[in-house]
Regions:
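Short beta-strand-centered segment that lines the nucleotide-binding/catalytic pocket of NTP-utilizing
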Residues: 70-84, 120
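Short acidic/polar active-site loop segments enriched in Thr and Asp
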Residues: 2-3, 113, 135
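Conserved nucleotide-sensing/catalytic segment adjacent to the nucleotide-binding pocket
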Residues: 92-120
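Acidic, Mg2+-coordinating active-site environments of NTP-dependent enzymes
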Residues: 6, 10-16, 135-264
Length: 264
């Protein structure tokens, strides 16, 4: 080793080795990984999806939607990693910072324009997303499902919130405000604050007109859209996808048409 990065200096220092003491080794690794791969997140539009439920669905369907719109797209999810059309096996919800940057770098090589990424509370807590430039963040909902890792629900919520706290001011923070934690996510963010809901007044509001075995008919901000996805929870997912696609510049008519083609 030429240099060792550590949080605590060892008792016996070896000659010829530089020791760099940092407050957080995982945070330092994340910034080093970004720099090593030449900051690949800056060369595409990266959107992080966080929340207890809906992360995989929202990220995967956004990948599908932008592929159908003719773009080169990336996906970092629990199920798989996609570098445009090439599929790789996923190991964690949020891979380690070296893996994330490696795949973002591959996406740069392929000319990928948009990447959608699941962001877990474990990943945020372990600094795996540090050093990445996000175009936007999406908050789906919060329930007591992951308290095996976090000591309290408040800690779990605050870890999620820290993701939005760190978004740059030119990014967007899109949150579900039917979940009472949605507004908490927006408290200290510098990003543009955008809301979506089915029950409350919001920037993007949907109403379920028909709920059938074959799909849902939704009214989204005065426009009707049919989707093959079923269930109330998918109405929220579709709304998050519609809003994100519009925030990323997709034209409304095309957005509605592509949503009607999505399959879970």
């Amino acid at each position: 080793a030429v240099a060792i990065i550590c949080e605590e200096l060892p008792t016996n220092l070896q000659d010829g080795i530089t020791y760099i003491q940092v407050e957080s080794a995982s945070q330092a690794l994340a910034f080093m990984a970004s720099n090593y791969y030449e900051n690949p997140s800056e060369n595409l539009k990266l959107v992080g999806v966080t929340g207890t439920n809906g992360k995989t669905t929202v990220a995967t369907l956004l990948y599908q939607l932008f592929k159908k719109a003719g773009y080169k797209v990336g996906l970092l999810s629990t199920v798989k990693i996609m570098v445009d059309d090439k599929e790789y096996k996923a190991t964690h919800t949020t891979p380690d910072s070296l893996t994330i940057n490696k795949f973002l770098s591959l996406m740069n090589d392929e000319g990928v324009e948009f990447c959608f990424m699941e962001v877990s509370s474990h990943g945020i807590h372990q600094n795996r997303t540090e050093g990445l430039k996000f175009e936007g963040g999406i908050f789906t909902n919060l329930s007591h499902d992951h308290l095996d890792y976090h000591d309290t629900f408040a800690e779990y919520r605050d870890v999620k919130k820290s993701f939005f706290d760190n978004l740059p001011k030119d990014a967007f923070a899109l949150v579900n405000i039917d979940d009472k934690n949605g507004l908490v996510m927006l408290q200290n963010t510098k990003a543009r604050k955008i809301t979506y809901a089915l029950k409350t007044y919001a920037d993007y509001k949907a109403q379920i007109l028909e709920n059938q075995l074959g799909g849902l008919l939704l009214k989204v901000n005065e426009s009707e859209v049919w989707t093959r996805l079923i269930g109330n929870f998918n109405a929220y997912n579709i709304l998050a996808i519609y809003a994100t696609a519009e925030l990323l510049g997709l034209e409304k008519v095309e957005n509605l048409r592509l949503i009607s083609e999505l399959e879970s």
